[in-house]
Amino acid sequence: MANPTVNELPYDKDDKREVEVSSLEVKPPVGEVVEASGDYSGFTQKTDPREIKLVRKLDMFIMPSLWAMYWLNYLDRNAIALAKLSSIEKDLGLSDVQYQTAVSILFAGYVVFGIPSNMILTRVNPPLYLCCIMVTWAVLSICTSFCKNATHLYLVRFFLGVCEAPYYPGALFLISNFYTRTEVALRVAILYTGNILATALAGLISIGIFKLDGHRGYAAWQWLFIIQGSITGLVAICTYPFLPSSPLTTRWLTPDERQLAHDRLLRDKIDEVQPGSTMDGLKQAVKDYRTWVFAFMFNNHLAANGFKNFFPSVVKTLGFNQTITLVLTCPPYLIAGVVTFFLSYSSGRMNERTWHITVSKIVAIIGFALAPATLNTGVRYFAMCVFTLGTYGVNSLILGWASTVLSQTQEKKAVVIAILTSLGNLSFVYTPYLFRNGDRPRYSLAMGWMAAFSLLTLLSAWAMKFILKRQNRNISGTGATTKYPY
């Protein structure tokens, strides 16, 4: 069957108008590609006041809810790192290796359930699904406080990973269902600041909670899990009314806004494929080699981010007391949050990914190299700030990039996001074992590996750029690339 015709416009590198696809009289069968007018640069320019108003309305309803949920997701997940500064190891009789296993086993659960969960997400009500799993992980977080030994902790942490696995890829799936390619990166960055600020503020929050040590017979680390888990469950219930399922069924949009939200995403598609089953989406994602390039890139990026589960312990090697140590964990992440926002804004504004990733990773490598090179307290803390800001800014760029390039069907996009987040989080299964107590205070082995992972992320970004440049030339048919190729 011949592909439907596409209205042709002469190529002009300075012309940023959207190219409209002619109406289709006959839909191709499932799995057949429909040639689209766009390319992988993803550049569109909003001029319609109705569309501008619509995007602002989407931002007001979607982003605060997803952000609050993700903030608590990471607050609950990172509680184990702060519990190490309390008495969890002593109370549960944990050895160094057992604590590392307790950290890593959460991500084993995450990897196991990540892909099946996102396949389910395309067949259920996403807001209800995400809020239900949030309530479940809140209960499991509270259950952590009642663990009596390493085995109990392993079980709770594993199932906590299973329940937390759907949230982040599910949130990315929702964002990519309502925003165009040029809008996604900034929204993912805003979402990701929830991760950063949770990590930044966790230490400050725990200062107050740790003062409850011994109250009603519970240790400080137990109160940490009880209080944070309770708040998580409450927020899960409160955010449900604000989360939409799809553009055409969103309750708080008018009929005209629903249609506009739907139509603008259709115009933004590349090589659209007719929707199929979840298994069709799985096959499409697995067979597309670009999925695996992005997965390799994201795995190495998160491996370079492996320090986050031990950051309070790394800061503790500076020699300050518990309260000062908790305070000092905050500034690096606050700085990283600001950098992440502006980096993603710049990336979206310039419609560029590779150089932004490159510069960030070079900064991170410098920080990882500097941290073990000296025992000077000021220089080491500066290095911690540098490798934190250099690492965190990249996350939203990679995921936003992948979710827009590989979005030919909803089913494929959901699986791609799940593959990336699952294989990315697989890195957290093995990176905890790089942070050995015997390597304190320099942690030279861990820092060396973090630098190597950063370099591999950088190189894979350049590989993807050249892949998409070649495909852009094929799409345009002129031998020219777009003004801002990825």
Segments from the language model and where they lie:
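Helix-breaking motifs and short loop linkers at transmembrane-helix boundaries and internal kinks
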Residues: 92-93, 116, 124-125, 146-152, ...
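Conserved MFS/SLC helix-loop-helix module at the cytosolic interface between two early adjacent transmembrane helices
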Residues: 111-151
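Helix-to-loop junctions at the C-terminal end of transmembrane segments
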Residues: 112-125, 338-352
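Glycine-rich segments within core transmembrane alpha-helices of 12-TM secondary carriers
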Residues: 185-218, 225-232, 417-431
